[in-house]
């Protein structure tokens, strides 16, 4: 909750009391990357898959791409409703939540980690509901199932990596007789970047960097 000062002239030496302002709903969610929850996050950031292909045996190939249009007026991507129970009587419900940032990171001795930054419109206190948890698979993606290729060729030089997606989304306040944000919209294009640590064993990638050579970066994780 924002606070703002009251500025006026009065016969006192102290400043007047401040007042409560805009109620902002923002935060990050971090979790080990399981296939099904990860799918919700990908949809939340990129929208519905551009293509879905059945691979048989309950396996599917989903292709997500940077969106070319907003989900709706005042909602750049599909909104979600989140319920958070902190073991204190009731649950906190956050409505109109959109996923702004998305991060995947991996390194040895660590599962694939996912972090999502969210922006919401409103919050309320509701009765606790009973969630249904994913029953299979019971383990997240592990580092020892990860393989990486650059420009179509497998490489063992990558020691750690982080994939970042920034939707550049923010809540927009207005004079609408409420402390909630009026709408949520983009302030710029969706940005995708990759960072990490690479074994500097030769000058191949250094030369590609100097020449600004564009290459395909493919990350593969498998899960039974």
Residue ranges of predicted features:
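Signature of extracytoplasmic/envelope-associated structural regions
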Residues: 1-224
């Amino acid at each position: 909750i924002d606070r703002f000062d009251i500025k006026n002239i009065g016969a006192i030496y102290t400043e007047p009391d401040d007042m409560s302002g805009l109620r902002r709903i923002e935060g990050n969610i971090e979790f080990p990357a399981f296939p099904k929850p990860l799918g919700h996050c990908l949809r939340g950031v990129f929208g519905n898959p551009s293509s879905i292909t059945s691979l048989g045996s309950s396996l599917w190939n989903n292709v997500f791409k940077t969106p070319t249009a907003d989900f709706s007026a005042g909602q750049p991507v599909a909104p979600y409703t989140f319920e958070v129970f902190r073991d204190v009587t009731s649950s906190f419900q956050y409505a109109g939540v959109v996923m702004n940032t998305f991060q995947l990171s991996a390194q040895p001795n660590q599962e694939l980690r996912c972090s999502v930054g969210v922006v919401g419109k409103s919050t309320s206190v509701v009765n606790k509901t009973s969630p249904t948890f994913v029953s299979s698979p019971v383990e997240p993606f592990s580092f020892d199932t990860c393989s990486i290729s650059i420009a179509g060729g497998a490489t063992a030089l990558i020691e750690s990596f982080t994939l970042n997606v920034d939707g550049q989304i923010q809540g927009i306040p207005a004079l609408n007789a409420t402390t909630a944000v009026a709408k949520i919209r983009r302030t710029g294009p969706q940005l995708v970047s990759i960072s990490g640590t690479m074994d500097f064993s030769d000058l191949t990638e250094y030369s590609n960097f100097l020449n600004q050579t564009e290459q395909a970066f493919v990350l593969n994780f498998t899960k039974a």
